[in-house]
Every structure is written in C-alpha cells, then in structure tokens.
Design a protein with these regions (language model features):
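Hydrophobic alpha-helical
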Residues: 6-7, 16-36, 122-123, 135-205
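Alpha-helical recognition/docking segments in bacterial nutrient-uptake
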Residues: 1-72
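Extracytoplasmic ligand-binding site segments that recognize negatively charged/polar headgroups
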Residues: 65-69, 73, 94-126
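Structured segments of extracytoplasmic/periplasmic soluble domains
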Residues: 8-16, 20, 33-37, 47, ...
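Hydrophobic alpha-helical segments within soluble ligand-binding/sensing domains
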Residues: 2, 61-99, 149-150, 200-204, ...
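Exported/periplasmic ABC-transporter solute-binding proteins
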Residues: 166, 180-222, 226, 230-248, ...
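Loop/turn elements at helix/coil->beta-strand transitions in domains of secreted/extracellular proteins
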Residues: 12-16, 36-41, 57-58, 101-103, ...
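Hinge/cleft segment of the Venus flytrap/periplasmic-binding protein
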Residues: 96-111, 223-271
Length: 271
C-alpha cells in the first residue's frame, strides 16, 4: 500500500518525498523508485537502518534519538528516587514492600518498532546501571494506545495489585491509560505506583500538573515538523545545499527534554 502511494506521487512529478516507513527494515523498493526518478527522500519518525540510508546520497532522516528518550526517562526515575531516599535506602513510598528493589511493569508501544525497543532497553539499563535493583513483574505491548493500555492494566491489576511499585511507559498515551485503569479501579493516589511517560503531550502535561503522572520526556514534534519542512523546501528549491552552499545533513535529530511538575508549564506554551 505504501509503495503504491509512493509510486503514484512519483508519477505525479513530486519534487521531494517525505516518508514515514511502515516497515523500517524494508525501504529498498521506495528507494529504488525514487532513485530512478532522481527524487530525494526524507524519511521521518521510523529511522531506517544505516546501510539503507547510505544506499544513495539523496536520502535523509528527520526524527529524534529514541535511545536518549529512554535514558532521560531513566534519569527522571533516578532523580525522584535520590530526592526521596531515606538514609541511603529506597523511599518507602516507592519500595512499599521494603525489599530493596523496585517491582515494575513496562508498557511497550509496538512490537518491532525501533523507538519502542530503544526506549525500553535504555530506561531499564539506565536505572540498573545506577545501582538500583529492578524486578520486572510483566510487560505489555499496548500499541501506543491509551484505551489498549487501560484494558491491559485492568487485566494485570488482579494478579499484581499492590506489588507494582513503578510503571514505565513508552509514551504518554499508554501511561494515561494506566492512570485511567487505576481511576476506574478506585485506587487512591498515594497507593499507586510511580508512573512515567514519554512525549510530553498536552494530556500528559495535564496529568503531571494533577500529580497522577510523575514525569515525562518531551518529544519536540513541532521542531521535527519544522526541520522536515525546511529540508524539503531546500531540496525542492535549491538542491542538496542550503543558501550558503552548506550541504544538508543526512540525519537531523531533535533533542528530548525532561519534564516534571516544576517545569511542565514551559512545554505547555510550546503546544
């Protein structure tokens, strides 16, 4: 389906292609079609593998570093833990059973999605590398969906109930779905696990303001959109160099930023 759409756009003599790959491991047909027409391609969101990006000098990528988002989410957890430690011990409001390790659930975005894999791997390794023991109770693939995360949390709760101390979500929407489940079950806020998201959506920022989500990592989608437009415009009007003769970078990544209650308002103004 996506290949057919690309073929149609090329037949309509487009100047530049902007493509969010359905399958990041299989871009070759799109690249071959664009190459035959000599039309540059800017991939965004799903980053193709390096070997594919290097197939041609008119291939570009705009997005963010999923590894960084996982690291920052882990750092947010560590900062909260360090700020609430009692005599070097994990805070009792987090380590409820007092066993010296954190029992956690993880909500993953999508099976095989690079961002999902990287966010999961790096948030866990960041916390563990800082010397905090973790015990994964379960994980759930909720496809970035608030409704799906709520449903899966409702299914998991009877099994684990008060054992869950920490919930790490690959995005805000799934974190919000978890919060919805706790609201529906009727668990009071001070008895809930610490919940962390990624993306800094409007609803996610509102949850931080209310205190139902502890923190998130801001994904600068507006900045990515502007970069995508700027590069597409340059390629269509000037070629592979900008107005000063500087070659356009093949990879443009916008940085993530930490968001918590003390600074969420500055990100709200960027919505």
């Amino acid at each position: 389906m996506q290949n057919e759409q690309v073929e149609e756009m090329l037949q309509n003599s487009c100047d530049v292609l902007c493509v969010n790959l359905v399958d990041r491991t299989a871009p070759s047909e799109i690249i071959d079609m664009a190459k035959k027409k000599d039309v540059p391609v800017i991939f965004f969101n799903r980053e193709l593998v390096e070997e594919d990006l290097n197939q041609w000098n008119k291939l570009y990528y705009v997005g963010a570093d999923a590894k960084q988002s996982g690291i920052l989410q882990g750092e947010l957890v560590l900062e909260d833990v360090k700020g609430a430690e009692k005599e070097g011990q994990l805070p009792p409001e987090l380590d409820r059973n007092g066993d010296g390790k954190l029992q956690y659930l993880i909500f993953e975005g999508e099976a095989g999605h690079q961002d999902s894999i990287m966010r999961t791997d790096y948030v866990v390794s960041t916390i563990q590398d800082a010397g905090i023991p973790l015990e994964r109770l379960d994980y759930s693939i909720a496809n970035w969906s608030r409704a799906e995360a709520q449903s899966k949390m409702m299914q998991l709760y009877p099994e684990f109930q008060g054992k869950i101390e920490l919930i790490l979500s690959n995005n805000d929407d799934m974190a919000l779905g978890v919060i919805d489940a706790y609201d529906k079950i009727g668990v009071q806020k001070d008895l809930r696990p610490w919940i962390y998201g990624i993306d800094g959506t409007k609803a996610g920022l509102a949850a931080i303001e209310k205190g139902s989500m502890r923190a998130t990592v801001y994904n600068d989608e507006v900045g990515q959109s502007k970069a995508l437009f700027r590069i597409a415009f340059q390629l269509a009007s000037e070629g592979a160099e900008d107005g000063e003769g500087t070659e356009i970078e093949k990879i443009t990544r916008l940085p993530y930023r930490k968001v918590r209650r003390k600074n969420y308002a500055e990100f709200r103004t960027e919505e």
